[in-house]
Amino acid sequence: MAEPLLSEFQHQPQTSNCTGAVAVHEERNPDRPPGAEERVPEEDSRWQSRASPKSGGSPGHGGEGSLEPQPSPLKTQVCPESSCPEAGEKGQNGDDLSAGGAPPQQRQVGKKKHRRRPSKKKRLWKPYYTLTWEEKKKFDEKQSLRASRIRAEMFAKGQPVAPYNTTQFLMDDHDQEEPDLKTGLYPKRAAAKSDDTSDEDFMEEAGEEDGGSDGMGGDGSEFLQRDFSETYERYHAESLQNMSKQELIKEYLELEKCLSRMEDENNRLRLESQRLDGDDARVRELELELDRLRAENLQLLTENELHRQQERAPLSNFGD
């Protein structure tokens, strides 16, 4: 009963569930054709079948006691590891892992996977809004050089190049020289004032020394006035651009009326100023006349005093 079982297993190829056993089996017999059976050495007792006679048995031809080398029966090796692929399992590329096509990660079991570690050199990174003006300027210059280099490389390769977007105009606006509004050296006030100086003159001089009511000097007031004029002109131009034709005509007529009204007011003020100038001339003449009369009165008083002294002199001589 043992011969039919042995003959049935002799013609079946050796199979294995572990890919490592298949690889070792192929390395031992690289030149063996795929259909050929492997001869088992006689001295190896592990490959003898259970039906073969033990030591001391009688030889026979094809029987149980024959000493002829028999081909090895079917041996199935079970892989103890759970990572070995089962029969019919396929990899990522569709390869049959059970037929020896194991991925290199499973073949190299002892090699560890390389893990990239962070650099020991710490990168001093700070948010852009926390940088100072000098640090922002250096950062923008570095980014500008890098962008110029990349744009040059893209232009050399024939790729379309867009203009570099930068914030340098903000730095230029910040670096503009602005007038010093608070650190001016103002002249000191006089320690003593004359008695004939009025309070109004004193307040005017104090306002001029302090640079006006806002506490700024002449440069600061000019800067504010120029800034206001530029802002008003820009706003007025934008408002005119947004107006329609009818609105522009209406605005023009209103401006003409305002101009004529201002001209009439100017003429009236000019006439009043001329009349006031005439009155001032009359007042000036009267003041000169008053000064002349005062001088004459003083002269008459001195002459009268001299006459009185002359009259008293003869009376004193007569009494002696």
Curated annotation (Swiss-Prot):
Start-end of Basic residues biased regions: 109-124
Entry similarity comment: Belongs to the HEXIM family.
Protein source organism: Bos taurus
Gene field: HEXIM1
One GO cellular component term noted in the UniProt record for this chain: nucleoplasm
Any one GO biological process: innate immune response
Function: Transcriptional regulator which functions as a general RNA polymerase II transcription inhibitor. Core component of the 7SK RNP complex: in cooperation with 7SK snRNA sequesters P-TEFb in a large inactive 7SK snRNP complex preventing RNA polymerase II phosphorylation and subsequent transcriptional elongation. May also regulate NF-kappa-B, ESR1, NR3C1 and CIITA-dependent transcriptional activity.
Biased composition (Polar residues): 9-19
Keywords attached to this entry: Coiled coil, Cytoplasm, Immunity, Innate immunity, Nucleus, Phosphoprotein, Repressor, Transcription, Transcription regulation
InterPro entries cross-referenced by the UniProt entry: HEXIM
Biased composition regions of type Basic and acidic residues, renumbered to the chain: 24-47
Region feature (Interaction with P-TEFb): 163-166
Coiled coil regions, renumbered to chain: 244-310
Region of interest: Disordered: 1-124, 174-223
Predominant localisation class: nucleus
Region annotation (Autoinhibitory acidic region) ranges: 171-211
Subunit field text: Homooligomer and heterooligomer with HEXIM2; probably dimeric. Core component of the 7SK RNP complex, at least composed of 7SK RNA, LARP7, MEPCE, HEXIM1 (or HEXIM2) and P-TEFb (composed of CDK9 and CCNT1/cyclin-T1). Interacts with the N-CoR complex through NCOR1. Interacts with ESR1 and NR3C1. May interact with NF-kappa-B through RELA. Interacts with CCNT2; mediates formation of a tripartite complex with KPNA2. Part of the HDP-RNP complex composed of at least HEXIM1, PRKDC, XRCC5, XRCC6, paraspeckle proteins (SFPQ, NONO, PSPC1, RBM14, and MATR3) and NEAT1 non-coding RNA.
Cleavable signal peptide: none
Cellular localisation: Nucleus; Cytoplasm
Protein name: Protein HEXIM1
Pfam families linked to this entry: HEXIM
UniProt feature, compositional bias: Acidic residues: 197-212
Chain intervals for the UniProt region annotation (Required for inhibition of ESR1-dependent transcription): 271-316
GO molecular function, one term: identical protein binding
